[in-house]
Amino acid sequence: MASRTVLLPSAVLILRLLSLGLLAASLALIAADKLNVDSDPPQRYTFRDVYAYRYVLAVAVIGCAYTLLQLPLAAVSIIASGNNKRGIGAGGGSVAVALLVLVLLADVVFALLLATGAAAGFAFTYDVKRYLDGQFDDDSIGTPEVDKLHRDMDKFFDLAYAAAGLMLAAAACMALVIMLSVYSLARQVRSDYI
């Protein structure tokens, strides 16, 4: 059975790994999202054609890089906790607290960035999908070309919704990491000064 001191850093590592997986899936979905329109000339739309989707992709890339940088710190924290040390900045008193606060602030900025990426993806997709659904009047529904275009557009926007949803789930994971980090910081400050 894992000791109680290892549970908190282990939970943080698991949440960071989950966040990385969600961001990688979001990145894959938004990068693969495309819409082909059979017109004269044929047109193809991808995330590059929509600034909000470019932002979602950029946030996913930055998020993956940040999470990959944080994974070794989470692993070191588990090892140090298993050895009855304090993890990041072990034994440094106020230096350890300063490092924990720095990591915590970086996590907050990262969580906010993820939330804005998800919001941009959701907001643009909702507005454009609602507008385009209103453009398909009842007279044009039923023709095979229009039905195919409508299905293709729905698929394009559904993939964008999925990418934004995965990014929102990654932001929720980071919010949990922040809560666990604040608890750990409060526990460490209490043990240092009381």
Curated annotation (Swiss-Prot):
First and last residue of the signal peptide: none
Extracellular side: 32-55, 116-161
Subcellular location(s) per record: Cell membrane
The keyword Cell membrane is annotated on this UniProt entry: yes
Database matches in PANTHER family: CASP-LIKE PROTEIN 4A4 (PTHR33573), CASP-LIKE PROTEIN 4D1 (PTHR33573:SF17)
Protein name in the entry: CASP-like protein 4D1
Coarse class of the protein's main subcellular location: membrane
One GO location term (cellular component): plasma membrane
UniProt KW Transmembrane keyword: yes
Quaternary structure (record): Homodimer and heterodimers.
Topology within the bilayer: Multi-pass membrane protein
Bilayer-spanning residue ranges: 11-31, 56-76, 95-115, 162-182
Keyword terms, alphabetized: Cell membrane, Membrane, Transmembrane, Transmembrane helix
Family matches, as InterPro entries: CASP_dom
Organism, as annotated: Sorghum bicolor (Sorghum)
Stated family: Belongs to the Casparian strip membrane proteins (CASP) family.
Superkingdom of origin organism: Eukaryota
Cytoplasmic side: 1-10, 77-94, 183-194
